[in-house]
Structures are given as structure tokens and as C-alpha cells.
Regions:
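C-terminal helix-cap and adjacent tail motif
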Residues: 5, 29, 159-190
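Short, electropositive alpha-helical surface patch
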Residues: 144-158
Length: 190
């Protein structure tokens, strides 16, 4: 459990009055979701918006697997290992189609492309009023094989990330009080 949390009115209730800077600074990972899944039409709209993400040579390798079945969601989250205690609503498994990368020098590119897509998808889901929590995916290969037993993910796709998605549980969101590093700690001008 997180020791410190902050509360604020959910971004979905204020989004129409925000510019991009306010929107970006107010997107937070949430872990408390209402019971029920997100309608497929909202997921489709968010994915369509996320498709504006750039990718190397415009390959657009990222694939989105939306899982609504509660038992499958639980199995995926158990394999992920870091989402224990979180309410389960729906899960997205983000993958990258490896066949689109032909050279060994590109072995990191699927992760880069999908990471950019992931951020775009998080923004898109937030824009449509859906709460998200991206979950780290560390795998030795066995976990991905196990997930493929529950979800029809082709072998040519590498699992890159898992995102817990759902409607906000209440009008007041709780999120981890994680301060961002100061710009001077991150930006180096040469």
C-alpha cells in the first residue's frame, strides 16, 4: 500500500476547461476503479486517438489487446505481479509486432515505439474520462507464454506493457503523492 496519497477531483470532471499543460500535469495513475468494464466504443475512440503516436519509419507496430473478462484480467495481473490489491476493471496488454523490425540493430525500437504509443494511449483514455494505471512488465519469457494461454496474442508480438483501465470509483481520485524531479535535474543544455 502507498503510504502517502493525494486526492483531487477526477480530471474527467474538469477536462473541458484545461489546456494541454494543465491536462498533462493532472493525469495520474489511479488504482481504485468502479466495478464493470469500459465500453468497447470508448476503447476504440481512445485507440484511434493514440494512433497519432509517431513510430520509427511509421511502422505502427503497437497492438492493443483489451481484456474485459474478469477472470482473465485477474490471471494477467497475477502474472504481472505488481497489481495485488488493486480493484480489477479491465486490462490492456500492449504488444509490439516484431516482424516489422528486420535488423538486429533495431532490437530496442519496438520498446521505444510502444513506449511512445503507451503515453499517447494513457492521454487518450484520460481524455475520454477513463482512469489508467500502467504496470511494469518484466518477463523472462515464461510469463508471456502463460499470458498467451489466456489471451490470443500471436507469437510474433512481444508484450511491452500492461495497463489497468476502468471508470473512476468516485468523483474524488486518490493517487500516489510522487513528486516530479525538477527540470534542472533532468534537462542538460550543452
Amino acid at each position: 500500500l502507498l503510504s502517502r496519497r493525494q486526492r483531487q477531483m477526477c480530471i474527467r470532471d474538469r477536462i473541458d476547461s484545461m489546456n494541454f499543460e494543465e491536462f498533462a500535469k493532472n493525469r495520474h495513475s489511479v488504482r481504485d476503479f468502479a466495478v464493470g468494464t469500459v465500453d468497447e466504443s470508448i476503447i476504440r475512440k481512445a485507440v484511434e486517438l493514440a494512433q497519432t503516436a509517431p513510430s520509427a519509419c511509421n511502422r505502427q507496430s503497437t497492438r492493443v489487446h483489451y481484456i474485459q473478462n474478469r477472470d482473465i484480467c485477474k490471471n494477467v495481473l497475477d502474472l504481472q505481479g505488481g497489481a495485488k490489491g488493486h480493484t480489477v476493471s479491465s486490462v490492456i496488454v500492449l504488444t509490439s509486432e516484431l516482424s516489422l523490425y528486420r535488423h538486429t540493430s533495431e532490437f530496442k525500437t519496438p520498446y521505444l515505439d510502444s513506449g511512445i504509443y503507451l503515453m499517447n494511449l494513457l492521454y487518450a483514455l484520460t481524455y475520454y474520462g477513463i482512469g489508467t494505471c500502467p504496470l511494469i512488465w518484466n518477463d523472462d519469457g515464461e510469463k508471456a507464454e502463460e499470458i498467451r494461454r489466456f489471451v490470443d496474442i500471436p507469437w510474433s508480438e512481444q508484450i511491452v506493457a500492461i495497463i489497468q483501465v476502468g471508470h473512476y470509483a468516485t468523483n474524488e481520485c486518490k493517487y500516489a503523492a510522487s513528486n516530479r524531479r525538477a527540470v534542472f535535474d533532468v534537462l542538460k543544455i550543452h
